[in-house]
C-alpha cells in the first residue's frame, strides 16, 4: 500500500482484485489517507459516469475494480499504473484488465504489477498461468500446432 500511496501523487492507478472484500480493505486504506478514488464491481450501474469521473478529474487518482467487471469494455487511458492484487488462474483475464490502459489516446508508459506473496498458492497460480500460456502458444503458433494441421473441412466440421 505504501507504493500505491507514493504513486498516487503523480500517477493515476488502476487496482484490480477478484475479491470484493479485498477491494473493501483497500478502499478503507485510501479513505484513511484521503486519496480520492472511484469504484466499480459487477453491481455498479453507473459505469460510464465512474469511468468519466476517473478520466476527467485530476484529483481522482485511483480506480478500484473487480477483475471481472473491469476487465472488458472500458478504456482508462489516464491510468499509467496497474496493480493486480491477487492472481487469477486465467492469464488472459489479467491481460484484459491491464489492457484497459493500452488504448488509443494513451500517451504515457504503463507499468503493471502483480502482487504475489512468496511461498503461497499465488505462486502456484502463476505456474498454472505459465502452463496455460505455453499450451495456447503451442496450439496456435507453432508449425506442429493443432490449428496449423486443420483442413478447411475440419474447421467447417467444428463450427457446424
Where are these regions (language model features)?
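ASCE P-loop NTPase motor core, strongest for the SF2 helicase catalytic module
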Residues: 1-160
Amino acid at each position: 500500500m505504501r507504493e500505491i500511496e507514493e504513486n498516487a501523487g503523480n500517477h493515476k492507478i488502476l487496482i484490480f482484485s477478484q475479491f470484493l472484500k479485498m477491494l473493501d480493505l483497500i478502499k478503507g486504506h485510501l479513505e484513511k489517507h484521503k486519496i480520492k478514488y472511484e469504484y466499480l464491481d459487477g453491481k455498479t450501474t453507473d459505469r460510464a459516469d465512474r469511468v468519466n469521473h476517473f478520466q476527467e478529474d485530476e484529483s481522482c487518482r485511483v480506480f478500484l475494480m473487480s477483475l471481472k467487471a473491469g476487465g472488458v469494455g472500458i478504456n482508462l487511458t489516464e491510468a499509467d499504473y496497474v496493480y493486480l492484487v491477487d492472481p487469477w488462474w486465467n492469464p488472459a483475464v489479467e491481460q484484459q484488465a491491464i489492457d484497459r490502459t493500452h488504448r488509443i489516446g494513451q500517451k504515457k508508459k504503463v507499468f503493471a504489477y502483480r502482487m504475489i506473496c512468496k511461498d503461497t498458492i499465488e505462486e502456484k497460480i502463476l505456474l498454472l498461468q505459465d502452463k496455460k500460456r505455453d499450451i495456447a502458444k503451442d496450439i496456435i503458433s507453432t508449425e506442429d500446432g493443432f490449428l496449423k494441421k486443420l483442413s478447411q473441412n475440419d474447421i467447417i466440421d467444428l463450427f457446424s
